[in-house]
Each structure stands twice: as C-alpha cells, then as structure tokens.
Design a protein with these regions (language model features):
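Beta-strand-turn-beta hairpins that frame and shape the catalytic cleft
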Residues: 1-4, 110-119, 171-176, 200
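N-terminal active-site segment of His-dependent metallophosphoesterases
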Residues: 1-50, 54, 223-226
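Active-site neighborhood of phospho(di)ester-bond hydrolases with catalytic His/Asp-centered motifs
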Residues: 6-7, 31-36, 57-62, 121, ...
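Active-site environment of divalent metal-dependent phosphoester hydrolases
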Residues: 10-15, 39-42, 63-69, 126-127, ...
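Short, glycine/charged-enriched secondary-structure capping and boundary segments
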Residues: 18-21, 46-49, 72-75, 134-135, ...
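His/acidic metal-ligating clusters that form di-metal
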Residues: 25-29, 94-169, 228-230
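Active-site neighborhood of divalent metal-dependent phosphoester bond hydrolases
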Residues: 54-110, 139-151
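Acidic, His/Gly-rich catalytic cores of divalent-metal-dependent hydrolytic chemistry
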Residues: 169-234
Length: 234
C-alpha cells in the first residue's frame, strides 16, 4: 500500500493544484491531509473546496479549528498582535459553508495495515475548560520528548505536522515522523509511506509551486501575513 501524506497547506492553492496533478497523488492507494488548510496564504476557500472534492482523508489543524469561531482565550493572551489580526481576518474570509466542511474533519485518523498501526494527526490536542488547543512544543526535540508528547497513542508509526519542519524520530521499533509544509515554502514537501508485508518505508518528496504568485495576491489585497514564514522563492 502506498500512502501519500501532506500537511500545512495554509491557503496555498497553487501548492494543492500542483500536488493533486502529480503522478504520486494519482497512484496513491490512500491520501491523507494532516490539517491547517487555513491561515497563511489568502485562498483558503478555494483550497477547502478542492480538498472537499478529493478522495482524501482530511484531518483538522489548529488553525482550521480557530477559524471556525473557536479561537481559544489563551491564543488572545499569548499570540502576537499580527497573529490575532491574521486569524480574525481569516474568520471573516472563510465562508460559513466552508467552515462547516472544515468543522466536520476529525482530529485524528488511525490505519491498521501490514500488521502495523499507523496514527495520523496534526499535533496533540488538549481540552482546557472546554476549549481545544494544540499542546505546547517540547523545548528539546528528540525521540524521548516526542514519545512523551504522544504517550497516549498506541501505534507503531505516528505521523504529524504543525511544526513546518521535517524530522523523523525512531528507536527501531516505533517511528514518529513530523512533516514540514507543502504550502508555505517552495518547494513544499510531502511523504510517501510504502507498507509492504511487515515493512514500512518512508520517502520524503518535494514539489515546486508558484509561492510568489500567492504572495503577490496577499500584498495586493493587503492581507496580514507573516513574512518570516512565507517567503518568496528565488
């Protein structure tokens, strides 16, 4: 079985179009999106509608949750003024119909194949007084701290996003794979998981897309975005 996993699209329609037109996307037995279709680039509605039309498992990201009128109070106290302005702008930009679509996505997905259990999520969630938020990142990232982060997950492989940096942590028996982002940079990355009998292989792949066009759209619209996270390609 070939599983294609991608994450952190962040409203980059060009990235999604390039990925869905790829041979890898076409021949994959299963496709899984790990969340954060919103907040970043300025075309979340188009991305949501295209994702919704695809044969693809969709998982809720923290920014997706926030734009569905669920911005936790903690986000207002610890986020920068620019981040809050961006989330409020996005809440107004995403249509009510698309919010309903996003709000229907699950926070996790589990797959049993080849005698192995694979677990997919955007990032670990916590419920504080009825408000969901992703947990804080560990200061030091290694197999021990990441395994503690997912201590309640019983799986052979855990695949997640959120951090926008690609990392793999393994002890030979259990693997934690953190994907980067397909949408915020070009080339963006995605993951092919090949499960054959009891063997699991990972191949990280890259796809070029016109991030400069997305940035031009945001500049023209006066959209508040983080220029440290979304950068022009050379």
């Amino acid at each position: 079985m070939k599983i294609l996993v991608f994450t952190d699209l962040h409203g980059s329609l060009n990235a999604l179009k390039e990925l869905t037109c790829s041979e890898d996307f076409r021949i994959a037995d299963k496709r899984i999106f790990l969340g954060d279709v919103c907040v970043g680039c300025s075309r979340p509605n188009e991305c949501i509608e295209l994702l919704n039309s695809l044969d693809c498992i969709k998982i809720l990201g923290n920014n997706d949750y926030y734009i569905c009128d669920h911005i936790p109070k903690e986000e207002f106290t610890c986020s920068s003024e620019g981040k809050i302005a961006q989330m409020k702008y996005m809440q107004n930009l995403v249509t009510e119909e698309n919010k309903k679509i996003v709000n229907s996505w699950s926070k996790e997905y589990c797959l049993n194949v080849g005698g192995k259990t694979l677990y997919f999520t955007h990032y670990p969630w916590e419920n504080v007084n009825g408000e969901f938020n992703v947990v804080d990142d560990p200061i030091e990232k290694n197999f021990k701290t990441i395994s503690e982060l997912f201590s309640n997950v019983k799986a052979d492989v855990v695949v997640f996003g959120h951090e926008h940096k690609s990392r793999c942590y393994t002890n030979g028996e259990k693997t934690y794979y953190c994907l980067g982002t397909v949408g915020l940079v070009s080339p963006g990355n995605y993951l092919i998981i090949d499960v054959n009998d009891n063997e699991i292989n990972f191949e990280e792949k890259f796809i070029n897309h016109d991030i400069n066009y997305e940035i031009d759209l945001m500049d023209k619209a006066g959209y508040p975005y983080n220029r440290n996270k979304i950068k022009r390609a050379n």
